[in-house]
Amino acid sequence: MFGKQTKSELVYLCPAMRLIVFICGFLGLLTLSSLMKPSGDTPGVRAAMDHFKSDALSFAASCTRLKKAAEAGNREKTRLALIDCRCRYKGIEAFLEYFFRSSATIYNRAPKYEAEEGGMEYQSPIGMQLIESMLFDPHPDKKNLLQQVDAVESAALDLPALLYNLHADDRQILESMRIELIRIMALDITGYEAPLLKSGIRESEVALTTFEEQLQLYLGDDPSSDSMRLYSGKASDLLHNKSFDDFDRLSFLRDAMLPLQHQFGLFIREHGVVLNTSKTMNYAADDLFSPNALLPEKFPGGDSGIAMIQLGKQLFNDKRLSGNGQKSCASCHDPAKGFTDQLPVSIGFDGHQRLDRNAPTLLYSAYQFDQFWDGRAKSLEQQIRTVLHDTREMHADSVKESDVLAIASYVRSLHPFNSPFDRYIRRENSALSTAAIKGANLFMGKAQCATCHFIPVFNGLIPPDYAITEFEVLGTTSNDSLTGKNLHLSADQGRYSQYQLDFFKGAFKTPTVRNAGLTPPYMHNGAFTHWRPL
């Protein structure tokens, strides 16, 4: 009996064991199904609400301590109190930002004006990020600082009341957790929300701990979820007691967070509790750096079929579209030059006149909600029509709408996601040199480049929703001289030329820096021919 046995013999000899295995498996599925339901009151939902209530009180208490520190006028103690506030906020962030987005804006909004272009209404900066900038101002306005702190504290004290009459389900809780993983990877570890305090690693640890506590309730004792526990634990270990400047973000992403995101997505799908309220994200993708993580068809414009893409490629290179038969789209957006012309500013229709701005790459341009440097076009189709009709550019005699749609389909397809960085993230160890790995960590960390050039497209598409294209006021110079008498700001007003709001003066769209080695010179006016001064 204890000798070599075939599979059929084992089945025959152990009917009782088969029954036990079946019952255990059934009970395990029953337990998980009781924890997760598409709707209704479940242990997962109750735990999330209880956690929110408890941590909201903790956050409110930290806001009160922040207020006392600010009133005392000790800047260093106030900064430390703000770090404590920010960390405690991370305990409620996933739930608050998901269920109460408008209420959340008072706490952690970017310290800039936000405008609704239709009616040109705008919201003034407010919240912890603005408080941070004030605490690092050499000459802060104490009255304004105290007003900001008081506004945050007053709102925080009322947080538990938000739960009144809230109806949530497990699908929503799990989606809020999914979004929080993206927030950790794309915002927290880069320093986007606290660039001066540099508390992003500590904040990430709190956010991940909150995620793990909620996750454990859903996993229970299910052994099939051991991989999730493994990657979550590894992510926590990598974050623990690490400084912001020295943190290895590539290892954190590649070895822990991206696999965790993948396994978490599988878990949600396998248990039939998928909910996707995102405008752009593809939850069927493996992870944030998968080529299909963002869906081009979810951005402005139409769907791109193969036939349309092929026709669009032909038209893109066809000089007959121009009024004089001398220029094509490829004249300024040459595929061999990263879909640019590598000139400071492009040459116009007549072959002599210089245009006003640099020709940006068309690679990954599908992943934007605004086209042109000033964002005056809301789709690739609108951009293409504008260029074809412009007397300084293509000066076309007539334009067929079918041609516009075809060219847009081709341009929309230009997102290869096959750079050495992409291959390294996909665990091709030899794809990046040691120097490049160091550079990527600096880019996403100490240098804070990724606070404007957000992962995974490395452009101004803002995480975690990826539903807004960001514009920045950098004070771009007219040349590459950054000091002395040759230092002059660019006269180009950027987005202000479209929307006459003072905070749009000098604002330009943040372009992708993918394949940037092929696309010099840089900035809207091509003022920088090399990376070093930039």
Question: What is the predicted role of each segment?
Answer:
Residues 4-7, 13, 20, 24-27:
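Short, low-complexity, charge-dense intrinsically disordered segments
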Residues 283-386, 424-533:
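Short glycine/threonine-rich turn/loop motifs
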Residues 22-41, 234-308, 368, 373, ...:
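Post-cleavage N-terminal segment of exported redox proteins
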Residues 106-167, 171, 314-322, 327-328, ...:
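Extracytoplasmic redox metalloprotein regions
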Residues 1-3, 492:
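Short regulatory "switch" loops immediately downstream of catalytic or recognition motifs
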Residues 39-291:
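Mature extracytoplasmic or organellar-lumen-exposed domains after removal of signal/transit peptides
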Residues 53, 57, 72, 76, ...:
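Soluble non-cytosolic domains of exported or imported proteins
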